[in-house]
Amino acid sequence: MTADKEKKRSSSELRKEKSRDAARCRRSKETEVFYELAHELPLPHSVSSHLDKASIMRLAISFLRTHKLLSSVCSENESEAEADQQMDNLYLKALEGFIAVVTQDGDMIFLSENISKFMGLTQVELTGHSIFDFTHPCDHEEIRENLTLKNGSGFGKKSKDVSTERDFFMRMKCTVTNRGRTVNLKSATWKVLHCTGQVRVYNNCPPHSSLCGSKEPLLSCLIIMCEPIQHPSHMDIPLDSKTFLSRHSMDMKFTYCDDRILELIGYHPEELLGRSAYEFYHALDSENMTKSHQNLCTKGQVVSGQYRMLAKHGGYVWLETQGTVIYNPRNLQPQCIMCVNYVLSEIEKNDVVFSMDQTESLFKPHLMAMNSIFDSSDDVAVTEKSNYLFTKLKEEPEELAQLAPTPGDAIISLDFGSQNFDEPSAYGKAILPPGQPWVSGLRSHSAQSESGSLPAFTVPQADTPGNTTPSASSSSSCSTPSSPEDYYSSLENPLKIEVIEKLFAMDTEPRDPGSTQTDFSELDLETLAPYIPMDGEDFQLSPICPEEPLMPESPQPTPQHCFSTMTSIFQPLTPGATHGPFFLDKYPQQLESRKTESEHWPMSSIFFDAGSKGSLSPCCGQASTPLSSMGGRSNTQWPPDPPLHFGPTKWPVGDQSAESLGALPVGSSQLEPPSAPPHVSMFKMRSAKDFGARGPYMMSPAMIALSNKLKLKRQLEYEEQAFQDTSGGDPPGTSSSHLMWKRMKSLMGGTCPLMPDKTISANMAPDEFTQKSMRGLGQPLRHLPPPQPPSTRSSGENAKTGFPPQCYASQFQDYGPPGAQKVSGVASRLLGPSFEPYLLPELTRYDCEVNVPVPGSSTLLQGRDLLRALDQAT
């Protein structure tokens, strides 16, 4: 039994030993095959003998794929000569990088031997590996895009070449330090490589091969040359004369530039500081430079490629720039950009202008020639110089730009008295036309112009500093004549240049109402309105028209002008559509006479005449002097805003005539009905209450506010009493009348436009409600007399008002559709205007207080004003 067991054991051991020996034999044979394969690789024996099996297989596969690529790309008839083989060894030494062949899957099937010089990793270590194992993860997507065909293989050679060219940047691991030491792969750093090449397509089977019975798909690979970008701080080779350094901010603005740019391109380093480099790029290269800038900010280094930089005096030069981002060693933040600029050519097309900076060179070469004309050292006559200058400028009109003075040039004044020209008198036989008697007309109408007639847009102003608004044009230092007579001189005396210039500057064209109205409508009147502060604490602004002296109470015979009829300028003149039968029946003669007179009045009276034959309006004064007598200042000075309204109201013709202080003629504008519809939306119109009164004294804002409160209080008391009278005399305590009065009071709100103000004080600003209240002199509303024509009223009734004539120089007219008949009583006044299509806008107390004008130079009550305010309060 034991012998059988021993025999079985020995037989099993023999089989195991035989299997082990067979395995050793197979492995030895495999090793021999691998070594034979390694020796077949185009590698040195010292390298191939130390390869493991995996490396041998990896390198062998890469070699076979490379050989297939070369065999498909290169033609069969090409035979390498010995000279070409010798030159192959010199190519790698001359190149600034290494060559790599990458398949469409990312396998590096070939790498040149000099890769270890730049990257530290050897050819054997990288060949056959995937490129994604040694590149930056952020660049993988860009690498994949460059490995594949973007637009397909194409059908033509041209389309194939355009779609297969590649130029990109990638970051790869580098084990070589700046000092030349080699570190471990785990301690490797990223180095930016500039990769340029193309994608090649080849067949899987060699040509004319019978082994490939079936059609195999096409293969593609990327053949690139990878050039590392050298850091500026590690440059050992000195820069040549065709290279200059520059430093930029992160947005490519120059912060430093080498002096060699002056002789290379023509720019001074100082004139480049602070300017962007994009200003000097050629327009066709701006897109590529923008892409290079993006790569620089993303990857830290970039090579711009060949581009054109504009020269200073025209043309451009070809450059290539290597940019590097310099990081702050403390916080590792980007600090600046260092650029090494290689000038590749001379200035090309220097006679072509590509930018505005190059236009300066157009006139610079001719400066010496032009200045020689005015050189006083020459003995050439003045006439010859003038003729030469005229011919020169006629041939080259662009030289006129150089004759204009530039900042820093000396300005030479021209002396007109140095040359005497004998010219015939141009005005010897000049005769004034009979229709334009200048001197005689001026002398005959001198009194009238001094007293009444005002030119358009002129207002007398005192030269008080602080109270006048600066005119449209600055004051001139030269003296000007005070009247047109000063422009005349005898024919024996020579004409003055100053007077001639002022004569040509005057506007001598006749102005008709249409043209003047057009000129006036072009002005922006809203910007000329008085300043109204939103809060009551703003600084006081002086009005455009300063305070004027008191006007005499005696009426003047000459017609005066004011701005109460300014609405006729801005409103369409449609008397037929607006007046209605109420006005046309009562005042046909007045309208006809007014129309006849307006055809012959000058523009100043048409614009500013209020029809007042009495005293002068406060907004007008004595006859203004023309522009020539104001020291060269512009006469575009504006009076206060006209007292107009937004909304329409009834136009009490008879009442206004009763409130006038003097006997007015029939043809005055005081009695004419309005000739414009109540649609004045472009201009802000204010009532006479807001406009303020310019009487013998100027009312302060505090006094106006106090008077408004007293007027409101008296109005409510009086209307309550009047309502009780109309309702049957019920006492205020009764429920029906008191409740009805509260409802009416809430409707009125203190500022109801349908109820007049009952103020009888002579010291308050006159307005339409004040004038209406003076008709009855304290009578209730239901006892108001019906309207009467102005002819039935006498001057005695007008004198009952007791107001100073200065306050009523300009009458205020309300514009609106006519009413059928005057109604009496409070209830009738509330219900009467309901059929009218227009109503006055409701003004709140805040609106009234905000729109109070700021008159005078004092904001506090003083002297007589304070006494009047105290008297009214008590």
UniProtKB/Swiss-Prot annotation:
Changing H194A: Decreases heterodimer formation with ARNT. One of its GO terms (cellular component) is transcription regulator complex. Residues 14-67 form the bHLH domain. Residues 84-154, 230-300 form the PAS domain. Residues 834-874 are annotated as: CTAD. It holds the Pfam family HIF-1a_CTAD. Keywords: Activator, Angiogenesis, Developmental protein, Differentiation, DNA-binding, Hydroxylation, Nucleus, Phosphoprotein, Repeat, Transcription, Transcription regulation, Ubl conjugation. GO terms for molecular function: cis-regulatory region sequence-specific DNA binding; DNA binding; DNA-binding transcription activator activity, RNA polymerase II-specific; DNA-binding transcription factor activity; protein heterodimerization activity; RNA polymerase II cis-regulatory region sequence-specific DNA binding; RNA polymerase II-specific DNA-binding transcription factor binding; sequence-specific DNA binding. It comes from the Eukaryota. Changing R171A: Markedly decreases heterodimer formation with ARNT. Impairs heterodimer formation with ARNT. Changing N184D: Decreases HRE DNA binding. Expressed in most tissues, with highest levels in lung, followed by heart, kidney, brain and liver. Predominantly expressed in endothelial cells. Also found in smooth muscle cells of the uterus, neurons, and brown adipose tissue. High expression in embryonic choroid plexus and kidney glomeruli. In normoxia, is probably hydroxylated on Pro-405 and Pro-530 by EGLN1/PHD1, EGLN2/PHD2 and/or EGLN3/PHD3. The hydroxylated prolines promote interaction with VHL, initiating rapid ubiquitination and subsequent proteasomal degradation. Under hypoxia, proline hydroxylation is impaired and ubiquitination is attenuated, resulting in stabilization. In normoxia, is hydroxylated on Asn-851 by HIF1AN thus probably abrogating interaction with CREBBP and EP300 and preventing transcriptional activation. This is Endothelial PAS domain-containing protein 1. It comes from Mus musculus.
